């Protein structure tokens, strides 16, 4: 301040030098800042510091070798104590919940219950399988209209004695022959040793006067001609097979007799074939 008054020139006599002490807040701020300084952290010497060096020191430095012996463990097992293993108590029966109690006392009752459940399940599955198989097989069977067409009713009074009438049955010719008494006696007297396909006449008819046959030659499937041939029965014009009045092969290349279908007499005047 004195230096400023000396350099002021003409204003020097007017100016006077004075000094006054002013309290500054810088010291207080410095003291407050010094009091708030935290102390350096103290490390726990017992707790290891995780670093690259400490972790590498715990790793294996040599190849792992498995040793087996009487007093040497064959493997190393690490136990995880933080895993909670369930005891399945919710799924166990009340008889086996007590660990201190033997389960042999209730084993018979538990076995009987298991057997009953198994048997009931097996019966149910079997019944369901039966229903499924029955429905599947019934779906493959012929319908009612097809079964109705598979049978044919024939009025026998429309066929005179000694005549043969042909019908269509299941797409095949059906022969119904009203035989005379002479034809019945003649066919019954034929020796079986003379036949290529031995079969007695009475085994091929239900009533001797009615002969019902499928009119398809057993050689290659041609339709024979009735009341023709060397034996007065049926003759196949394709390859010359001769059948008698009972439909049995007597001559020619046919190996078997004419087929006899399934039929039933509803009355003396009505027969159902099929």
Swiss-Prot record:
Record flagged with keyword Amino-acid biosynthesis: no
Topological relation to the membrane, as annotated: Single-pass membrane protein
EC numbers: 7.1.1.8
The record's free-text note on cofactor binding: Binds 1 [2Fe-2S] cluster per subunit. Fe-S cluster delivery to the Rieske protein is mediated by components of the iron sulfur (Fe-S) cluster assembly machinery that reside in the mitochondrial matrix (including HSC20 and LYRM7).
Mitochondrial matrix compartment spans: 79-103
Gene Ontology molecular function, alphabetical: 2 iron, 2 sulfur cluster binding; metal ion binding; ubiquinol-cytochrome-c reductase activity
Transmembrane region(s): 104-140
Keywords, alphabetical: 2Fe-2S, Disulfide bond, Electron transport, Iron, Iron-sulfur, Membrane, Metal-binding, Mitochondrion, Mitochondrion inner membrane, Respiratory chain, Transit peptide, Translocase, Transmembrane, Transmembrane helix, Transport
GO biological process: respiratory electron transport chain
Record localization: Mitochondrion inner membrane
Residues in the Mitochondrial intermembrane compartment per record: 141-274
Recorded catalytic activity of this chain's protein: a quinol + 2 Fe(III)-[cytochrome c](out) = a quinone + 2 Fe(II)-[cytochrome c](out) + 2 H(+)(out)
Main location: mitochondrion
Residues annotated as binding [2Fe-2S] cluster: 217, 219, 236, 239, 241
Keyword Transcription regulation: no
Disulfide feature: 222-238
GO cellular component, one term: mitochondrion
Domain of life of the native organism: Eukaryota
UniProt PTM: Proteolytic processing is necessary for the correct insertion of UQCRFS1 in the complex III dimer. Several fragments are generated during UQCRFS1 insertion, most probably due to the endogenous matrix-processing peptidase (MPP) activity of the 2 core protein subunits UQCRC1/QCR1 and UQCRC2/QCR2, which are homologous to the 2 mitochondrial-processing peptidase (MPP) subunits beta-MPP and alpha-MPP respectively. The action of the protease is also necessary for the clearance of the UQCRFS1 fragments.
Family recorded in the similarity comment: Belongs to the Rieske iron-sulfur protein family.
Name of the protein in question: Cytochrome b-c1 complex subunit Rieske, mitochondrial
Organism: Saimiri sciureus
Gene behind the chain: UQCRFS1
